[in-house]
Amino acid sequence: MEVTKKRKIRSGEEYDHLFPKPLFLDPTIKKGATVNDTVRFIPQVVRETLSQTSKLAPLLKGSNVYETCKNIWEFVYHHIAYKKDEDGKEQIRSPARGWHDRFHGIDCDCYTVFISSILSNLKIKHKLRITKYSQDHFQHIYPIVPTTGGNYI
């Protein structure tokens, strides 16, 4: 399941001041990395770059967890384009780099870092879920927020 057409992304220039300038580094963390390596690496990136969404996070806080998650989803959907990474290349961008690259597009790993960072700044417990569709390997990752009764947002 992939995006079939580009959507119009809002400018977001009113939020630019909330993000530090990104470091334009693209280090290779591990050659031949697996999905499991990526899943383990994302929380590390979130911890190391948590300050990058600390000014944005309070602006997205709603009156409850559900409203907050909705605000985060709408912000990301309207301000950051999706674009799958090149085959064989997995980029894990910091939130500042993801914001900078928002018109070009970022993939689900980078969306996950961005959203997980906001949730972490708001002290909202969440997990990362990986899934696959019609292929034998995992293709998608996204954050989920547990709710009472065993459900997830």
Where are these regions (language model features)?
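Histidine (H) residue identity feature
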Residues: 17, 78-79, 100, 104, ...
